[in-house]
């Protein structure tokens, strides 16, 4: 496909004016740069493909001193990202060995399709089976698992609250918690309707997105992490955080989930309110006085010791991937330039793991759960997923 696009570009030079020639040269230069980027990442990619397959062996994060890979079973909310990483690397490189390994890991996620104790079905199933379906669109097995998973996920929907319940723990604290992360799981529902033709999944996803839009944001478009609803009346009981610094702070990854979630929701609905929300939350993020110059945020924008706070490369990767898509809907070059800058920053020695590190990860310097002192300044699997997706989206823009 890349060769075909390149050939079309070359043949078209005969008919292009000077400006178009300049733009074509720039595209070719960027395409060459992408090739160099993949070459520089090849050693890290090999660490992923050589990692041993196992049902309880999904790599979630990694300590570096000493080197210890933190492994989880398929029930963990992060388990679907590693199969997704392999699918994305296959798409980026065309090397079939990554597809073979992606298939082996993906089938290990099937046991989650009836797990009704989690809201993270999209992360688990769509990042694995969904990525597989993109590359094998006639695979009925993948379609069936996605549909069954969507059926399971909507059992957590409450029609009074008009949202999908997030966690089941802390029932003495929360009646019906909904976290901003949950926006990411709507993609599974939107796709389930496309596959099955049944609008129930799409409609529930829209209801959830509407409720979140109404209650989860402050006037400046920063996001609350957790909204607690009353299941009898549907009204908001409390607005809180679980992974941010405090209830009034802006947790960087939460803001990233919001940017990505409403950009993705616009893709499936063409609802201008979702596009406006994606742009407003992006503006808050990009213009925040505490965002470092390299575009990789501190774990929370309001950490009182901000200059010494750990960064969160995963949040940067999520936003970068989202902005490449948001650019296609708005033609706002500010988004493209910012995303390109941050992608280049992530794809540098400052954030890439050294070749000598043996774990199946790519990026360093992500922060998982600061309040619990868990996964601080470490490689984390979902950071890699959105980094790889951002690389792919950038490639698609260049080859378009």
From Swiss-Prot:
**InterPro entries the record matches:** 6-hairpin_glycosidase_sf, 6hp_glycosidase-like_sf, UG_Glycosaminoglycan_Hydrolase
What Gene3D superfamilies does the database record attribute to this sequence? Answer: 1.50.10.10
Biological process (GO) annotations?
polysaccharide catabolic process
Enzyme class, top EC level, equals hydrolase
- What UniProt keywords are attached to this protein's entry? Hydrolase, Signal
Q: Coiled coil located at which positions?
A: none
Per UniProt, subcellular location reads as:
Cell surface
What Enzyme Commission number(s) apply to this enzyme? 3.2.1.-
Its function? Unsaturated glucuronyl hydrolase involved in ulvan degradation. Ulvan is the main polysaccharide component of the Ulvales (green seaweed) cell wall. It is composed of disaccharide building blocks comprising 3-sulfated rhamnose (Rha3S) linked to D-glucuronic acid (GlcA), L-iduronic acid (IduA), or D-xylose (Xyl). Unsaturated glucuronyl hydrolase catalyzes the cleavage of the unsaturated 4-deoxy-L-threo-hex-4-enopyranosiduronic acid (deltaUA) at the non-reducing end of ulvan oligomers, thus forming 5-dehydro-4-deoxy-D-glucuronate.
The family annotation for this protein states: Belongs to the glycosyl hydrolase 88 family.
Which protein is depicted? Unsaturated glucuronyl hydrolase
> Which organism encodes this protein?
Formosa agariphila (strain DSM 15362 / KCTC 12365 / LMG 23005 / KMM 3901 / M-2Alg 35-1)
């Amino acid at each position: 496909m890349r060769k075909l696009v390149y050939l079309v570009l070359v043949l078209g030079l005969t008919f292009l004016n000077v400006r178009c020639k300049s733009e074509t040269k720039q595209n070719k230069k960027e395409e060459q740069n992408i090739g160099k980027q993949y070459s520089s990442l090849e050693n890290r990619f090999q660490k992923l493909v050589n990692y041993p397959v196992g049902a309880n062996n999904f790599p979630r994060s990694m300590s570096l001193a000493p080197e210890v890979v933190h492994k989880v079973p398929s029930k963990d909310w992060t388990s679907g990202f590693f199969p997704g990483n392999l699918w994305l690397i296959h798409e980026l490189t065309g090397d079939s060995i990554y597809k073979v390994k992606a298939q082996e890991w993906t089938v290990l996620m099937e046991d989650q399709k009836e797990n009704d104790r989690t809201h993270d079905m999209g992360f688990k199933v769509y990042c694995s089976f969904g990525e597989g379906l993109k590359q094998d669109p006639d695979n009925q097995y993948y379609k069936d698992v996605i549909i069954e998973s969507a059926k399971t996920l909507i059992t957590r929907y409450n029609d009074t609250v008009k949202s999908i319940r997030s966690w089941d723990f802390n029932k003495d604290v929360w009646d019906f918690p909904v976290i901003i992360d949950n926006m990411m799981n709507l993609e599974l529902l939107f796709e389930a309707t496309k596959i099955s033709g049944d609008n129930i999944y799409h409609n529930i996803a829209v209801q959830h997105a509407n409720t979140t839009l109404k209650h989860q944001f402050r006037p400046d478009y920063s996001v609350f992490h957790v909204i607690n609803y009353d299941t009898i009346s549907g009204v908001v009981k409390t607005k809180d955080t679980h992974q941010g610094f405090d209830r009034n702070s802006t947790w960087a990854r939460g803001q990233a989930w919001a940017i990505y979630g409403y950009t993705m929701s616009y893709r499936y609905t063409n609802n201008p309110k979702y596009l406006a929300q994606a742009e407003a939350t992006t503006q808050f993020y990009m213009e925040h006085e505490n965002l470092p110059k390299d575009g990789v945020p501190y774990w929370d924008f309001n950490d009182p010791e901000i200059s010494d706070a750990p960064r969160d490369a995963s949040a940067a990767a999520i936003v970068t991937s989202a902005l490449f898509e948001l650019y296609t809907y708005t033609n706002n070059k500010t988004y493209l330039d910012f995303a390109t800058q941050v992608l280049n920053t992530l794809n540098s020695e400052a954030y890439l793991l050294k070749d000598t590190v043996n774990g199946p990860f790519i990026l360093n310097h992500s922060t998982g759960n600061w309040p619990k002192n868990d996964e601080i300044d470490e490689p984390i699997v979902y950071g890699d997923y959105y980094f790889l997706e951002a690389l792919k989206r950038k490639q698609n823009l260049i080859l378009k």
